[in-house]
């Protein structure tokens, strides 16, 4: 019997097939799904911010793109994954609110998306697909069995990436 494992904001969880991982309420946040298809191990990290370098308190590694990805790689390797086999899919990074002036500092979703992609490249993890941007939230369900990432939205349908 498979179960669905809930991943909260600034949280990280792993699952092996047939279990699935879900996170709801991705606005400017990004869900980073990594998986090793050989052992059917997957992880989901729900990051909120692009970098831990400016944070006063960076103790929660899952909160940031840079440390969240390192956490996921480290924990997956402890559970038998090989970093060289890891593949990624991401979703989120929306611009949920319109701000006057539109300074880059307020474009958290876009900054998160860029930071996640840069960190994936840094760790030589191939990004297979992404569903980022826009101005709407997402709920995602990741299946380590198939590598499918189901993206559900309100008003923008559902799709598997």
UniProtKB/Swiss-Prot annotation:
Q: Does the keyword Hydrolase apply?
A: yes
Q: Hydrolase: present as a keyword of the record?
A: yes
What the entry lists under InterPro entries is as follows: CheD-like_sf, Chemorcpt_Glu_NH3ase_CheD, Cytotoxic_necrot_fac-like_cat
Q: EC annotation? A: 3.5.1.44
| Gene3D superfamilies in the record | 3.30.1330.200
| Entry keyword set | Chemotaxis, Hydrolase
Catalysis: reaction(s): L-glutaminyl-[protein] + H2O = L-glutamyl-[protein] + NH4(+)
Give the Gene Ontology MF terms in alphabetical order.
Answer: protein-glutamine glutaminase activity
A Gene Ontology annotation in the biological process aspect, one of them, is: chemotaxis
* UniProt-listed PANTHER family: CHEMORECEPTOR GLUTAMINE DEAMIDASE CHED-RELATED
Q: Which family does it belong to?
A: Belongs to the CheD family.
Described function: Probably deamidates glutamine residues to glutamate on methyl-accepting chemotaxis receptors (MCPs), playing an important role in chemotaxis.
Name of this protein: Probable chemoreceptor glutamine deamidase CheD
What is the originating organism of this protein? Answer: Syntrophomonas wolfei subsp. wolfei (strain DSM 2245B / Goettingen)
The protein's gene is named cheD
